[in-house]
């Protein structure tokens, strides 16, 4: 760890009316209580709060009046794969965008309050190309805004002026280690994962003191020789164990004082090329529950062993108190633990992997409760009543150059776009893609620079004509409430409101609202560019606003190859848009 006292970044304070300056001056430090019980008008984390619900209790915009939404303001942002979720704190929007930029913006007018731009001092050729322009999340705590950089730094900015408080170099940025999803704040600790798709080693999660940036702990995923799990890597040398990291969004449960994160797969994709035939590989595709102060692993559960298909299990899961009562007749049932206690329990639940399986665990102990399919998949062969996964042997690579057909693709099923969860109805809304693929291991020698070393051709699952999809599932029973499908790829995060709406973007450039009860499309508005940003909502002076950032179709463009009719996408015109209902006369 290195502390860079003289930052290469630049903060610019905008010169405007005193009212704008007052908004920044009046901001009070954000406390743990404030993050864990967010005031209704604020949005203080990627999923609004540390539990990652992606839900706001605001109810001014309703199914009955959503069609009246009008654009209030918009402003251009740096171009790139815009996947960001703005934070809103007492009328100030904090926005991270491509090209290592963080801005403070007046949330009611769109006026710039300050801007910080980080300047790389590493040759971009050495950096992780996948995370180049992706800033999904930033964090706020105390008086600071926290974000991670392309070259693997953790930076804290003063929220009032954008000046650097600290800059921590976590190391190996010039060897491809990076982060795209940003940190979570857990009881005074900044917890941050990492991505190393092109690296000849594994990655880690770190915990940092929120005031100083001091690294408190570092957890690796790939076992070294002699460590627990070493014998599950097929006798391969440590130098052959590549890429496993944790780049998805994390969740914090203040009741149990646990941070939950998930790990990714390894490379190359083919276990034949890895020299690990049949090896389950402890550490990959695993859900971890850790103590934020120390990094102590309290429990773990592997949700996709022996991964030949890049089915990374690193996406957010949510924590809530529910009435556990899994239905034996749930659609896509894989397994129900007959020994798991039903009734009131605090659970960790969600869709953590690209396979699209919905998993549920006891939040404190990790006891498996149930698992079910959502999207079409044929690579999980069996899950027993303890949640142990066996893969479908027919879909495992046997030789280089020999293709297999499998579902879903290495883009999901479900990928990183955020789910939304209504804690009142206990329904989770999951963005997915109907897609399968033919993948072939390349015959050239595997190398970290080639990542998974495969070729892929996408197609729709048999019997499907629509690529885009959103499922609503009751997490208490596991039963499907409704399913919304559309011709174009969705591949965009979701947001739910207390008034009964679900908002989403998509590759087709539409910002849309669905009815939470039925899945009916109620409203949509077409923006200049495709939408991968996370919708958020907030309230200032009694008025509710809806915000979304757009700018790129991302992998939605690749997935569109499955569609019969091509989507009208655009990667030009990156901007943040803010909508509201017209003032009553």
Listing of model-derived features with the role each one plays in the protein:
Residues 536-585:
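Blade-level signature of beta-propeller repeat domains, shared across WD40, Kelch, NHL, RCC1
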Residues 104-112, 136-169, 175-221, 358, ...:
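Hydrophobic or amphipathic alpha-helical targeting/insertion segments
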Residues 22-77, 81, 111-127, 163-172, ...:
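Aromatic (tryptophan-biased) beta-strands that constitute blades/sheets of beta-rich domains
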Residues 7-15:
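Bacterial N-terminal signal peptides
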Residues 318-375, 379-380, 398-409, 414, ...:
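Phosphate/diphosphate-binding loops
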Residues 43-47, 79-101, 127-154, 178-202, ...:
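Repeat-blade elements of multi-bladed beta-propeller folds
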């Amino acid at each position: 760890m290195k502390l860079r006292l003289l930052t290469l970044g630049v903060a610019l304070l905008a010169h405007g009316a005193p009212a704008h300056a007052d908004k920044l001056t009046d901001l009070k430090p954000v406390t743990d209580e404030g993050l864990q019980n967010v005031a209704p008008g604020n949005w203080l984390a990627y999923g609004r709060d540390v539990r990652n619900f992606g839900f706001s209790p605001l109810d001014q915009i309703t199914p009955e009046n959503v069609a009246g939404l009008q654009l209030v303001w918009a402003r251009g942002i740096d171009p790139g794969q815009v996947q960001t979720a703005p934070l809103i704190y007492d009328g100030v929007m904090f926005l991270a965008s491509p090209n290592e930029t963080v801005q403070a913006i007046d949330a009611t007018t769109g006026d710039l309050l300050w801007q910080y731009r980080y300047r790389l001092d590493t040759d971009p050729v050495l950096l992780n190309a996948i995370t180049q322009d992706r800033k999904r999340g930033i964090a706020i705590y105390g008086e600071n805004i926290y974000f991670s950089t392309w070259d693997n730094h953790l930076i804290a900015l003063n929220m009032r002026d954008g000046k650097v408080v600290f800059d921590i170099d976590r190391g190996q940025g010039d060897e491809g280690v990076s982060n795209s999803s940003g940190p979570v704040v857990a009881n005074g600790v900044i917890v941050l994962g990492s991505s190393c798709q092109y690296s000849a080693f594994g990655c880690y999660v770190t915990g940092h003191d929120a005031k100083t940036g001091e690294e408190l702990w570092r957890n690796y995923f790939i076992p070294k020789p002699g460590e627990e799990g070493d014998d599950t890597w097929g006798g391969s040398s440590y130098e052959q164990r590549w890429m496993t990291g944790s780049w998805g969004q994390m969740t914090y449960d203040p009741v149990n004082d646990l941070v939950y994160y998930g790990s990714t797969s390894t490379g190359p994709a083919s276990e034949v090329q890895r020299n690990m035939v049949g090896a389950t590989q402890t550490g990959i595709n695993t859900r971890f529950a850790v103590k934020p102060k120390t990094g102590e692993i309290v429990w773990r559960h592997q949700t996709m062993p022996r991964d030949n298909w890049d089915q990374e299990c690193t996406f957010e899961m949510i924590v809530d108190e529910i009435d556990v009562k899994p239905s034996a007749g749930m659609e896509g049932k894989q397994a129900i633990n007959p020994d798991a206690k039903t009734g009131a329990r605090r659970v960790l639940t969600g869709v953590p992997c690209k396979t699209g399986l919905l998993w549920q665990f006891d939040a404190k102990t990790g006891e498996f409760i149930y698992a079910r399919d959502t999207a079409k998949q044929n690579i999980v062969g069996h899950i027993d009543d303890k949640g142990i996964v066996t893969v479908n042997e027919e879909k495992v690579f046997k030789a280089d150059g020999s293709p297999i057909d499998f579902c879903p693709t290495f883009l999901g099923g479900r990928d990183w776009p955020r789910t939304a969860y209504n804690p009142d109805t206990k329904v989770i809304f999951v963005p997915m893609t109907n897609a399968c693929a033919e993948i072939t291991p390349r015959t050239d020698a595997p190398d970290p620079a080639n990542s998974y070393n495969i070729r892929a051709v996408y197609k729709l699952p048999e019997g499907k004509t629509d690529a885009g999809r959103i499922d609503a599932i009751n997490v208490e029973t596991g039963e499907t409430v409704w399913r919304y499908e559309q011709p174009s790829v969705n591949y965009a995060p979701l947001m739910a409101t207390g008034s009964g709406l679900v908002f989403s973007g998509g590759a087709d450039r539409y910002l849309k609202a669905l009815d939470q009860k039925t899945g009916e499309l109620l409203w949509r508005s077409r923006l200049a560019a495709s939408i991968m940003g996370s919708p958020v909502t907030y309230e200032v002076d009694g008025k509710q606003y809806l915000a979304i950032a757009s700018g790129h179709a991302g992998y939605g463009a690749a997935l569109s190859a499955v569609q019969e009719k091509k989507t009208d996408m655009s990667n030009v015109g990156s901007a943040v848009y803010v909508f509201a209902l017209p003032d009553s006369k």
